[in-house]
Amino acid sequence: MLIFTVFISLFISSFPLSQGAINHSEKNTFVEGQSIYLVSDEHPYYNLLTSPLACWYTDKDQSLQPLLLVQGQTVSARQQDFISKFTSDSTIISIGFTPKNYAVDQTFVGSPLLLSYQLAKDYFPKSDKALILPIDEIIDTYTLALLSTPLASYLHMPILLYNPNQQQHQQLFLTLESLNASSIYAVGSKIPSQFQDSYKLIHMKNTQDIQELMLSAIQNQFKKINYVTLTNPKDVSPLNLLDENNESIQIPIQHTSLYVLGKKFVLSGSDTVTKKITIPQGIHKYSTKITMKEITSVFPNDGSTPVFLSATLTDPNGRTISYGHSPGYRTNATYIETLITNHSGEYTLTISLFYGYRGGYFSLRGVSDVKTILEIDQHMQTLNDAHYPLISDLSQNAAYLTSAHGGIMIADEKFSLTDETYLEIADHHSTGPWYDETLQEYNNEKVNFIISRLQKNLSLLKNHDLYNGYVNGSGWLALLGDTNMIPMYYYPSNQTHLAERGLPSDNPYSLNHSLSPGRVISYTASDTSLLIARTLFYEQVCGPPTPEDEWHRKFNFVFGEGFGETGGFFHQIPYANKLESYGFLTTVYGDLRNSRQAAERLNVYTDTNYVEYLGHGDWFWFTPSIYGFNSIGQSIGAVQVRS
């Protein structure tokens, strides 16, 4: 066996796997009955109103309950699975909607403005203080409200909304009267004049006022901070549509192919089809979904046969501008999308299909046989500007995520890559910086701007004796946004033979490795909220780690060839040694080209909770065994995780 292993066997029976229950101070975690909040994604303020209900702190107690963002009034199967595993006697509460497919115990519906008064009365019969947030249709207003929402959790007070463009606020003052409130924390530059006359007023006019008050509350409540969330509030804004067109066509494809001694022999038909697409002048978001229909093959059609369906879109100059592969999307389907800015002409969509078994490395061999219909659904949205979130509404999760970790938030629509300046720079371009290196300079300027904003906000921590503990300790930085809303930095690469350009990285956000940055994203904002819930309540859902079930604390390190050995010896082995002091069971594997089947038999990738891999591969799939007749059938892709 040519696999290289280093076993570190120090055993410690208990260790923290996650930060599940909030424990930012020595308070007791107090839960008055288990509740799960299902929140509509149709308006971002529903999530803001619910956050201080699901997460709150007092001088002696604290409470954290799951909050799940629901897309389109339908509770997903994965969300239902989480609910069933969380606890059997939870009270299920929906905010802002009535689920179409799931029975709940209590429902609160209505506009965010009116709902804020109802929730305050129901959850805070008496409160000497309240957080008053503005609500209108302007992103700047939402930004201020989003930034200040964690304060309601830290000071355990209700959120009440007001429209700064209206003169009458009778319902607001009636609610304050019923709460018996004496102090109000008001956000916004135009607040009702009655606040000054009738209450002790703490006025937060701008983002700096909010951050200073937030940091004071954190210092008083927790004495430390180890979490900051970066997000872009503009991701709740829809595309600025000028026109929209859909087209669906079906193209038959059939082929039988053999792979012998590394060469492909097409015995019948063709494994590739092309389609010409005419793009007019203007700004367009173009997307295509390709799905296989009515599959006929000598191989089973029960999901067990490996399928590689890929699509490549090239511009009029023949340059790749978008690529999709079924292992990264769905079984029997793939998807591509791109932003085209004033680059009209004839584009080419190329679709390739493999359906069968294939393996080997130096001597590729295999067979593919399929007859199917490719359904091509094209969607072209003509836009007035370049605003283009890849994953909409992620910022809706920011308040709850931040509050659960006792942190602060940094939010600004100026973090967007696809702004007005980008539209000028990307004129006559058909893709983003990932395929076009000429766009990377502006992309990196935007990253540096975000970093400067991060540093400016972190400097405020010094005024509250929180700075050193954050940047010199285990400070976490959550990047809650896609790479158009919070772009990655592109390092230069000499791999010019690849269609992709540069090496994207979030490392600059670490501030020279003084912070631990990570993207908190999934396919949708709803999926992301579920990811957050699974993380916060990991032990409650999966059970606490026990000596009998060591899977919880196993951490496997794998390094491959092609300079992967350097990372294995100088990073992974020392890091594994460090982790053992926290109770992890660690093993370091050197995965050579001809040892992958051995790694598979040793369950290197499956019999462990954590895996760190240094080697070649794609983000969306990995082949643990590159030899054997069916190596691609043994691959693990994002599609398996998703389904």
Regions found by a protein language model. Name each.
Residues M1-A21, Y46, L144:
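Secretory targeting signatures
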Residues T5-I8, I12, P16, C55, ...:
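Compositionally biased, low-structure terminal segments
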Residues F7, I12-S14, T87, G560, ...:
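Intrinsically disordered, low-complexity serine/threonine-rich segments
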Residues F15-P16, L176, L579:
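Hydrophobic alpha-helix position signal
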Residues Q19-K27, A499-R501, N512:
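N-terminal intrinsically disordered, low-complexity tails enriched in polar/charged
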